[in-house]
Amino acid sequence: MQNLTATLLVSCPDQPGIVAQIAQFIYQNQGNIIHADQHTDFSSGLFLNRVEWQLDNFRLSRPELLSAWSQLAEQLQATWQIHFSDQLPRLALWVSKQDHCLLDILWRWRSGELRCEIPLIISNHPDLKSIADQFGIDFHCLPITKENKLAQETAELALLKQYQIDLVVLAKYLQILTTDFVVQFPNIINIHHSFLPAFPGANPYHRAHERGVKIIGATAHYATAQLDEGPIIEQDVVRVSHRDNVDDLIRKGRDLERVVLARAVRLHLQHRILVYDNRTVVFA
């Protein structure tokens, strides 16, 4: 059984002594720090920190910890989160008709590689219901048209609330979410089938082939109101040549999409990402 830990993510205006204050807060309450990482963005004057400590002998209860830390955070003018290792995030997978990212995430989850709960799959097509059934996950098909999009998004938000979802993963969900939806539920990771900012939008492999590119890539990012412009979490590339046709590019691209999305989801579940100024610091 793993030791129970707490993970603090914090960002605040940079100033001397922040690390010492955080470490002292944990030490004086009998916490043992096991991981700590930090970054200072000098251009924005921002300090960013991730620290994880054992709770075995910690003298504060969780409500007391949150209350005590909030007082110090207020002094630091900090934005912060605290996560506990025994509270597994609840994840919803959204898909359309392509199954490669869905199957990869589900396999990693079943094997224990991704520490989370996956109680819900949402799709705008019925095609992948058999996969949900195979894994014992509830499947809800909500077809999207121009006329019913807002009503269906209301239904989707209700499902996220019903299933107490913490994170939505767009595992090749080929619908554009409205600004209102993203504002109401901002914890969304998308996999984009190109190395952003190159070739945003549809058919990137066809456009990449037409341009004769020498590498193709995949990008996992948080979804925002601006299409394919959210904070980037993870990226990767693979070399291609003039001998590769569009099908070759699609095949290689799908391999990248699987791996890049899985990395991004794992980083989020491990609370290793801080977002600021539409970009991320990843404490990998």
Curated annotation (Swiss-Prot):
ACT domain boundaries: 7-90
Keywords from the UniProt entry: Hydrolase, One-carbon metabolism, Purine biosynthesis
Keyword Hydrolase included in the entry's annotation: yes
Primary enzyme class: hydrolase
E.C. number(s) listed in UniProt: 3.5.1.10
One biological process term in Gene Ontology: 'de novo' IMP biosynthetic process
UniProt superkingdom: Bacteria
One Pfam family hit: ACT
InterPro entries referenced in this protein's UniProt entry, alphabetically: ACT-like_dom_sf (IPR045865), ACT_dom (IPR002912), Formyl-FH4-Hydrolase_C (IPR041729), Formyl_transf_N (IPR002376), Formyl_transf_N_sf (IPR036477), PurU (IPR004810), PurU_ACT (IPR044074)
Single GO molecular function: formyltetrahydrofolate deformylase activity
Similarity comment text for this entry: Belongs to the PurU family.
Function: Catalyzes the hydrolysis of 10-formyltetrahydrofolate (formyl-FH4) to formate and tetrahydrofolate (FH4).
The protein's name: Formyltetrahydrofolate deformylase
Organism whose genome encodes this protein: Synechocystis sp. (strain ATCC 27184 / PCC 6803 / Kazusa)
Source species taxonomy: Bacteria, Bacillati, Cyanobacteriota, Cyanophyceae, Synechococcales
